[in-house]
């Protein structure tokens, strides 16, 4: 079941998701041992490893340009994607090219190309723009690069309020997913699913 504590991590827009997922979610696994052992942990735990959530740890943080501004908040993020939960819940979100992809954040944002990043957004409703993707994923992951704080908010995609994850996102940070009705551009709440591998970490 989805706990009260988990519901508190999602935004108001996602509260209805929690209600739907509560009927199907597996009991969350225990938090990682290193978090349990911390005394007086901050409200949003920070990790020395900036790519702690990465699905592919071959990512080279030193190659990221310009100097990234790392996200330090714990709010829910979202990602529109064409892959269904049978794939994402098993694999997480893997980047297209961790080794040889475009590491410059501005170049990656302005021109869609293979990169070590997986994009997410602060904006729950952005899926309405990318509704043809088919699914709106809810993500609770530490870190990520705040794109607008890194390259400014005057670029043409600034309204997407992106958080880019170098190395992608491991499956345990995906809360769940709602399919999107491509006609009405709304989430099909009755078909939302929770991720049995999701592990709360804060």
Q: Where do the language-model regions lie?
A:
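NAD-dependent ADP-ribosyltransferases
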Residues: 2-13, 29-202
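C-terminal segment of classical bacterial N-terminal signal peptides
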Residues: 19-28
């Amino acid at each position: 079941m989805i706990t009260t504590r988990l519901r508190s991590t999602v935004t108001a827009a996602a509260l209805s998701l929690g209600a739907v997922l509560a009927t199907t979610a597996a009991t969350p696994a225990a938090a990682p041992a290193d978090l349990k052992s911390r005394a007086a942990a901050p409200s949003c735990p920070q990790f020395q490893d900036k790519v702690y959530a990465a699905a592919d740890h071959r990512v080279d943080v030193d190659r990221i340009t310009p100097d990234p501004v790392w996200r330090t908040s714990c709010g829910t993020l979202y990602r529109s994607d064409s892959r269904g939960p049978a794939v994402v819940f098993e694999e997480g979100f893997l980047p297209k090219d961790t080794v040889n992809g475009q590491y410059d954040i501005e170049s990656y944002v302005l021109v869609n190309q293979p990169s070590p990043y997986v994009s997410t957004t602060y904006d729950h409703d952005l899926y309405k723009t990318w509704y043809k993707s088919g699914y709106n994923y809810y993500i609770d992951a530490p870190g990520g690069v705040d794109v607008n704080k890194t390259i400014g908010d005057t670029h043409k995609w600034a309204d997407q309020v992106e958080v880019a994850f170098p190395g992608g996102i491991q499956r345990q940070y995906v809360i769940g997913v709602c399919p999107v009705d491509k006609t009405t551009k709304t989430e099909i709440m009755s078909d939302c699913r929770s991720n049995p591998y999701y592990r709360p970490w804060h």
